[in-house]
Amino acid sequence: MAKKLFIKTHGCQMNEYDSARMADLLGESHALELTDDERDADVILLNTCSIREKAQEKVFHQLGRWKKLKAANPDLVIGVGGCVASQEGEHIKKRAPHVDMVFGPQTLHRLPTMLDSRQGAETISMVDVTFPEIEKFDHLPKPTSDGATAFVSVMEGCSKYCTFCVVPYTRGEEVSRPFESVMEEVIHLADQGVREINLLGQNVNAYRGENQLGDEIDLAELIGCVAAVEGIDRIRFTTSHPVEFSDSLIEAYGEIPELVSHLHLPVQAGSDRILAAMKRGHTVEEYVDKLERIRALRPDISFSSDFIIGFPGETEEDFMDTMNLIQRIGFDASFSFVYSPRPGTPAANLEDETPEATKKQRLAILQERLNQQTMQISRRMVGNTERILVTGFSPKDPGQLSGRTENNRVVNFRAPNPTELIGYFVDVEITEALPNSLRGDLASPARY
């Protein structure tokens, strides 16, 4: 009987990508098969995230639950990866000695060797959280995909060192993946039926990959090359930094139809004073100028962003500046949360006199405004016929198909031949706007 692998993933899309590659890697090296039940697993991996508050405690709470599984099955192998693993390293083994392996985002390709060492000599403490550049992509097997969409990591790390952010310390400095390596993966995925590619990086628009001739390829050029791959009809990218949003990338919205009419561009705050304290490297007006230039090329584009509320020193005036920016741009959605200090970052040492109750109240006001704007945009879509990439059945209603619009809205609809439409584009007339999705009717039986 094949041995089983269980992976629990916290955090961002980059972690989702890394977890999928771990499954591919261990499937090839040790014939491990994925399971959805941790109780059936022979190997359990926890892929961690350090962005949100109490990330470490969340990890150790999960490891505490798995201690019982280890006691019942001493042969069970438990590994911890991701950004918390980079931060904590050996401390994870000290606090949770039942953990067998600790590895960082840049060393997940060494999992087969670590697993062999663990199984061969149980007393060896396997901890590897180094930053070996982009080496891991040279050792990972070709990805497998059974869906219409896929993530492709094009770079690792971040060199911006925003004062609130732990990513440069857990993922390392920016390193771009070679151009040919990215394109080989995209072509391989397209051959498996993938229609939409999401290019990933902590600061993806800083991508500067070399081709075999030694020429530098930026993100705009990469997107153009991905768009030329037969079968790829949609391209997204995330996450971006405003400073790196180049003229060529802006112009891509007028030149590459496969690039979707949706952009997630984190701004974090609408106050120049707070942006400077965050060391973001740009002003509000510089940010707005980029979005206005993109909107001139794509009038129907939707923008989403990230917002941190209650950054140390934030005044009521600073908060209102953020609210004004939200209304001015007409953001479609956001990831927004109350600031919490990340250990080892400069902002963790700043005085913070704003009461937590005030921060939570501001967050509620911001989220209410954004929810209103989201619904306004959704309601304007009612009556439109939208091009939907069908990704599968609705999790809440298996009788309905589910897919996404260009502006990243989930659309649920019924069809007489549902299984034949999965993985294809169809035209759907939007009939109803709901808080988190849209409903529609199939406008044409044709798939393409």
From Swiss-Prot:
**According to the UniProt entry, what is the EC number of this protein?**
2.8.4.3
Q: Name one GO cellular component term.
A: cytosol
Task: Specify whether Iron is a keyword of the entry.
Answer: yes
Which cysteine-cysteine pairs are annotated as disulfide bonds in the entry?
none
Q: Which residues bind [4Fe-4S] cluster 1?
A: 12, 49, 83
One of this protein's Pfam families, by short name? Answer: TRAM
Asked whether the keyword Transmembrane is assigned, the reply is no
Q: Where does [4Fe-4S] cluster 2 bind?
A: 158, 162, 165
**What is its subcellular localisation?**
Cytoplasm
Q: What does this protein do?
A: Catalyzes the methylthiolation of N6-(dimethylallyl)adenosine (i(6)A), leading to the formation of 2-methylthio-N6-(dimethylallyl)adenosine (ms(2)i(6)A) at position 37 in tRNAs that read codons beginning with uridine.
What is this protein identified as? tRNA-2-methylthio-N(6)-dimethylallyladenosine synthase
